[in-house]
């Protein structure tokens, strides 16, 4: 074997010496020196999934207590697989038990992960170290998870989030009035008054809304979406009237509703969508309404003073049927009962392939 040259030995010794020198904690030093706004900007350029992964792996990031401006928690955020993969060799009861056990495991994993992200951001039990633009939880939570739901609602308010969503319609295994017992009674009162003054957009799914007498509205709410929400006609009317700045309302699969009459003027309302809610009668005054979407459940519609209504869209609940299967006599009766004298365009979505329009 050839002898190493003196130059090679020198390089080798230097490398060995460098390896023994403790490397400075560059990442930690940089994080401590960078301004808060710069760190926040770095996080905002990443997906929430990447931020969660980075926070898990890096203690330095956790110590900074800096949060992504949009916290959107779904099963995909944490890579939770929700495929039940049933064993069809078992009995029906055994399959149901297995599915329930898996669902409980998914939910426990989801709650643990959300708590792991939020826990470092609490400075006290009622205040946080961060401000958010959006806070969303989209998972199949139920009334038995109320402790965490209420805690996360409090966090979203304390962080002054503008856009809040608690959509629990994922993996719904029970629908209808008999399933109200599984829905969380959502603490809407926490958003009422000054505490919810930052909220401009609210999405609620698979919850039960009961307005307390002290409810005084969500001051700056402009966009409201209710999906599979249990709410009485009186509470819905009170909710809409108490949010004076509402511009966009979306109501779908809500119950038990048969009619909605609002005598007072919704002067800011521009968009209204009512679908799959068995709401037979709708009457409201919205002078600035421009777009309206509805289905055949609405047998009577009275939109008084809607002089700016430029577009109305009828979406049939039987769109999966063949076009020739429609009972056009019933459809004609539906439209003779409508009071849309000022609409400029009426779109009829009758099945998946056809859109009929009348100008």
Kindly give the residue locations of the regions a language model identified.
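Conserved "Asn-ladder"/turn position within leucine-rich repeats
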Residues: 169, 207, 229-231, 254-255, ...
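Extended repeat-based solenoid scaffolds, especially LRR ectodomains
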Residues: 298-359
């Amino acid at each position: 074997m050839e002898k190493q040259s003196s130059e090679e030995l020198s390089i080798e010794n230097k490398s060995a010496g460098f390896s023994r020198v403790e490397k400075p904690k560059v990442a930690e030093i940089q994080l401590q020196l960078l301004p808060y706004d710069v760190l926040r900007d770095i996080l905002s350029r990443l997906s929430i999934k990447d931020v969660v992964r980075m926070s898990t792996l890096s203690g330095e990031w956790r110590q900074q207590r800096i949060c992504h401006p949009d916290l959107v928690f779904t099963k995909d955020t944490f890579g939770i697989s929700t495929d039940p993969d049933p064993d069809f060799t078992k009995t029906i009861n055994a399959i149901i038990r297995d599915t329930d056990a898996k669902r409980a495991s998914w939910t426990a994993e989801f709650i643990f992960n959300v708590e792991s992200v939020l826990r470092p951001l609490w400075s006290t039990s009622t205040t946080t170290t961060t401000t958010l633009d959006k806070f969303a939880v989209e998972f199949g939570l139920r009334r038995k998870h109320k402790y965490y739901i209420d805690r996360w609602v409090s966090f979203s308010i304390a962080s002054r989030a503008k856009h809040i969503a608690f959509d629990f319609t994922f993996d719904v295994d029970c629908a209808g009035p008999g399933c109200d017992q599984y829905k969380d009674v959502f603490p809407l009162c926490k958003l009422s008054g000054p505490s919810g003054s930052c909220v401009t957009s609210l999405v609620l799914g698979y919850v039960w809304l009961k307005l307390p007498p002290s409810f005084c509205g969500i001051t700056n709410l402009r966009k409201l979406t209710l999906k599979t929400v249990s709410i009485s006609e009186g509470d819905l009317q009170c909710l809409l009237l108490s949010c004076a700045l509402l511009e966009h309302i979306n109501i779908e699969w809500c119950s038990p509703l048969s009619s909605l009459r609002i005598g007072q003027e919704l002067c800011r309302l521009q968009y209204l969508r009512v679908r799959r809610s068995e709401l037979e009668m709708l009457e409201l005054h919205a002078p600035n309404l421009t777009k309206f979407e509805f289905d055949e459940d609405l047998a009577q519609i009275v939109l008084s003073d809607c002089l700016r209504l430029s577009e109305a869209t009828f979406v049939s609940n039987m769109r999966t049927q063949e076009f020739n299967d429609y009972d056009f006599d019933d459809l004609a009766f539906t439209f003779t009962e409508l009071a849309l004298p000022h609409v400029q365009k009426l779109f009829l979505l009758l099945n998946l392939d056809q859109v009929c329009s009348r100008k």
